Amino acid sequence: DCADACPEQAIDLSSPDKIIRDKCTQCFKCVDVCPSGALERCGNDIDMDHLVEKVLEDEAFFEASGGGVTVSGGEALMQMDSVGELFSRLKQRNVHTLIQTARLFHCNVFENLVLPYTDTIYFDLKLMDSDAHKQYCGVPNHSIHENFRKVQALARDSVIEVLPRVPLVPFITDTDENLSAIADFMLENGVKNMQILPYNPIWLDKLPRFGSVQRLDFGEGTGKFMPDAELDRCTEIFESRGIHVHCHR
């Protein structure tokens, strides 16, 4: 059965989650032998030629709307070689390119492989306190902030648009202290425009799909959309410093 087929012993049918995600290497041997078809691959392997061909099927829509291609994640820049090749081929057809990143990457490699073919960068900033960033995101934020400074400096000497974004999470990223620190950091680096991403509780229902039976709760408001008054408070922290805020409500 699937448990016996797994070379990493990542399937434990007696556990609530069934699949131990930390052990799974996505070899898909369990999928190949699953007798009921309950396990299946999500996504497909695709080569660059096929990917570019699929993307360019919408080229007429890009031209008519002024749109283009956004690469997101996860962290898309964990695959910098592929992103760079994709963007370079799209720019040969004058397709607008945008990348969304949390900026945990080697900036010199990014500057050589991806930046020359990028029109717009969405840069997510979550927490200014490094200890809190490590607690909630798994890593400190020193290199992220340094990358932000470098990319901002590069963008000032080019036509690249950089739009910093702050995802709002109740009692974690949306505190006055954290948002004020982010706003001051943006000012130091010449930011004039940014975007706040209102909290969306729909993610809670996605947990079981990722094999988690634990329902996270970080206080009142976890299961609710953020009220307009709270969005106004967050917006004012940036606009009081002269930073224009984009917010889709």
Walk through the language-model features, giving the residues of each.
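Iron-sulfur cluster-binding cysteine motifs and their immediate structural context
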Residues: 1-22, 29-45
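Conserved dinucleotide-binding and phosphotransfer motif residues
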Residues: 37, 92-93, 241
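Conserved AdoMet/S-adenosylmethionine-binding subsite of the radical SAM
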Residues: 49-209
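A structural motif corresponding to the C-terminal lobe/cap of the Radical SAM core domain
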Residues: 184, 192, 207-237
